[in-house]
């Protein structure tokens, strides 16, 4: 009796294995062709050891289990988000040698090491977006001992100006400030030049009135306090994104509603931080598909997928990259690309951190040490701006 039970379980196991193989091959064929998969075509390509009738029977069971749905026009089967989840969990990263060579050549655009960490991460995200032809975002902690290297003033209208601070590590800080009155022609440029020289401790290269100098220092001190406050007291990682227009090349995103859902999700800082941080200590990519994203954002099925992967300095995760695309992504190629990409980035970041003795901070939303007093902010920030006494 026990032998019969064991044989029955063995036959069931073999059948499940065959059904699993049919499902994986059907998804693979669908990803390659973009067309609904029929039993005859699947037999001719990947399942020659099975009859068309057997494949149809397996298709019927997979439909019942929610992995496939029937296309009413062609009669073929289309994978569901549950099927893509199964495929993402069971497929291995695969890249052709030619693809590996192209990726490695692209990654040579990144430096061997650099102090300009944020700028290099932004460059890396541009490269990854170009390779995958997909939108990419990444999270970043705050790096210590940064220095403001440049100041720019951009006029919006007669009474408003955009103040732009750029730092040695590639950070950008912008804010809109109000002017007390309309400035004469070229006055703003003279103030900008004065502040750039002041920042570098150089004598002013252009003559300006005492009124212009006083206004320049007022604007400077105001934006410094705002910058230090934001730098020291932040509740979320910094997020950067690129390549959103690349979604338009995919058929599913040509529908305005689907495109809007995908973009709104990708641009939602709270949701993206939640995804990027959820598997920060897992070195392999993590995939969120279809309804799994809907559970997070709390609205209709966005019909898209997000793949996240952390990036490391030595054995310490610094942040994560996220890739947005349709559910029918070429998962094997994406996983393989992300593996090469993060390994290269890990080497660069590790060398940079040890060479320049860099450090970083995580968000601290309730840290009582993050005082709002300007002098205290200056002491805590590790940002080279003004001495504390000039801010009190």
Swiss-Prot record:
Keywords: Repressor, Stress response, Transcription, Transcription regulation. It holds the Pfam family HrcA. Transmembrane segments: none annotated. It comes from the Bacteria. The keyword Cell inner membrane does not apply. GO terms for biological process: negative regulation of DNA-templated transcription. One of its GO terms (molecular function) is DNA binding. InterPro entries: GAF-like_dom_sf, HrcA, HrcA_C, WH-like_DNA-bd_sf, WH_DNA-bd_sf. Negative regulator of class I heat shock genes (grpE-dnaK-dnaJ and groELS operons). Prevents heat-shock induction of these operons. Belongs to the HrcA family. This is Heat-inducible transcription repressor HrcA. It comes from Chlamydia muridarum (strain MoPn / Nigg). The lineage of its organism: Bacteria, Pseudomonadati, Chlamydiota, Chlamydiia, Chlamydiales.
């Amino acid at each position: 009796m026990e032998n019969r039970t064991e044989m029955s379980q063995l036959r069931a196991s073999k059948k499940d294995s065959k059904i699993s193989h049919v499902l994986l091959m059907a998804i693979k064929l669908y990803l390659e062709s973009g067309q609904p998969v029929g039993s005859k075509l699947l037999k001719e390509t990947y399942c020659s050891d099975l009859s068309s009738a057997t494949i149809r029977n397996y298709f019927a069971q997979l439909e019942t289990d929610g992995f496939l749905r029937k296309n009413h026009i062609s009669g073929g089967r289309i994978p569901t988000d549950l099927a893509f989840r199964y495929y993402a969990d069971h497929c291995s990263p695969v890249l052709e040698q030619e693809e590996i060579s192209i990726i490695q050549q692209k990654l040579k655009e990144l430096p061997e090491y650099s102090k300009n960490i944020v700028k290099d991460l932004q460059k890396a995200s541009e490269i990854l977006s170009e390779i995958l032809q997909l939108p990419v975002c990444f999270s970043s902690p705050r790096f210590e001992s940064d220095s403001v290297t440049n100041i720019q003033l951009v006029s919006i209208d007669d009474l408003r100006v955009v103040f732009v601070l750029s730092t040695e590590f590639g950070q950008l800080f912008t804010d809109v400030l109000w002017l007390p009155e309309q400035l004469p022609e070229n006055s703003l440029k003279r103030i900008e030049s004065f502040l750039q020289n002041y920042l570098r401790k150089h004598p002013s290269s252009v003559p300006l009135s005492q009124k212009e100098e006083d206004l320049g220092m007022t604007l400077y001190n105001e934006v410094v306090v705002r910058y230090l406050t934001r730098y020291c007291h932040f509740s979320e990682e910094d997020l950067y994104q690129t390549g959103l227009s690349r979604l338009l090349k995919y058929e599913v995103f040509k529908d305005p509603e689907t495109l809007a859902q995908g973009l709104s999700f990708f641009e939602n800082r709270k949701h993206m931080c939640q995804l990027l941080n959820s598997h920060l200590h897992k070195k392999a990519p993590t995939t969120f598909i279809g309804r799994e994203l809907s559970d997070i954002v709390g609205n209709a099925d966005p019909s898209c997928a997000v793949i996240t992967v952390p990036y490391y300095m030595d054995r310490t995760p610094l942040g994560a990259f996220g890739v947005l695309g349709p559910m029918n992504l070429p998962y094997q190629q994406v996983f393989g690309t992300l593996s090469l990409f993060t390994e290269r980035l890990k080497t660069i970041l590790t060398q940079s951190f040890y060479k320049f003795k860099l450090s970083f901070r995580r968000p601290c939303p309730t840290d009582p040490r993050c005082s709002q007093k300007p002098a205290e902010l200056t002491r805590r920030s590790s940002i080279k701006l003004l001495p504390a006494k000039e801010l009190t």
